[in-house]
Amino acid sequence: MWKEHHLAVQKLKTHILWPVSAVHIGQSAQNVNKMTEKIELTDLSKDELTAEILKIGEKSFRAKQLWQWIYFRGVTDFNEMSNLSLSLRQKLQETFTITRPKIVAEQISIDKTHKWLLEFKDGERVEMVYIPEKDRGAVCISTQVGCAMGCRFCHTGSQKFTRNLTVGEIIGQFMVARDAYGEWPSPTDEIRYLSNIVVMGMGEPLNNLDNVVKALNIITDNEGIALSRRRVTMSTSGIAPRIVEAMQRTGVRLAVSLHAPNNAIRSQIMPINDKFRIEEIMKACAEYQKGEHSRYITFEYLLLKGINDSLDHAKELINLLKKYRLRALFNLIPFNPWPGCGF
């Protein structure tokens, strides 16, 4: 399973997605009357959902029923929730909403890789990708509109950061994919095609940590989507102080976008390295692996010709892992140039 997941991650990084002009259209300034806006149920944890149901005068068990309709059956229309009374369904419609991102464009490649361009209520857009592998596959989801990291090799890095995604917007991406592949009600782990999630789309997950944690806890909840935590990988460009916290709060797999064997090279291609040096990242990874439920770490390494791809660089990487005694895998990624990338 891990080998197939690892290959899916590698394959994901070789695809060029939508042009910058298509992804970011800058409509976040649209005015929305927050006083009349309905509560988005996919923004709520199970406890928060229960509290809202109690507020409208219903019993707490109704929250469990609603949770299963949303996350086990994938229903967005309250009228389809057949075990709820008509009066309750009307009450839910007046107070709440269950929203999916709007599909603006989609593309399926010859190898069945499926790409979506999704739009949220304020007009902002993100990318999502499904990468199939035999009888399973990984869905790559985004956590921010744009990205503040500015990695020189990254297409998203050429866009300005606009905002964090909400909990519902993060979850909504995966639910769009499940709509597309008919995976409602939630299938078992053995037969699901959307078997893995990789949190390595647009944005830096650790800079939207609270929303990402909440979204992943909902996605892995046993009474809903019920995706195993071992089938979720969160990738970071190296926000060292938050690595241990992120892993402790989610229990998912860790991937680190390393891309260089030393600080000199990494700072050239990843500005974040001037703030969090390789040594600090490695120490955080080592601290994480001291934990009882730690897993192998994947280090993502994009091969840039003449910059980080020599035999000496490979030896440096080996010595780096030995120094910090890390249990890790390297994901070697061929670079797929995009217009204006400079490589």
Please annotate each region the language model reported:
Residues P132-E183:
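Canonical Radical SAM [4Fe-4S] cluster-binding loop centered on the CxxxCxxC motif
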Residues H5-H6, H15, H24, N33:
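Intrinsic-disorder-associated, low-complexity terminal segments enriched in Asp/Asn/His/Tyr and depleted
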Residues N31-G137:
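Flexible, acidic/Gly-rich N-terminal and inter-domain linker regions that tether
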Residues A180-D189, Y193-F343:
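Conserved AdoMet/S-adenosylmethionine-binding subsite of the radical SAM
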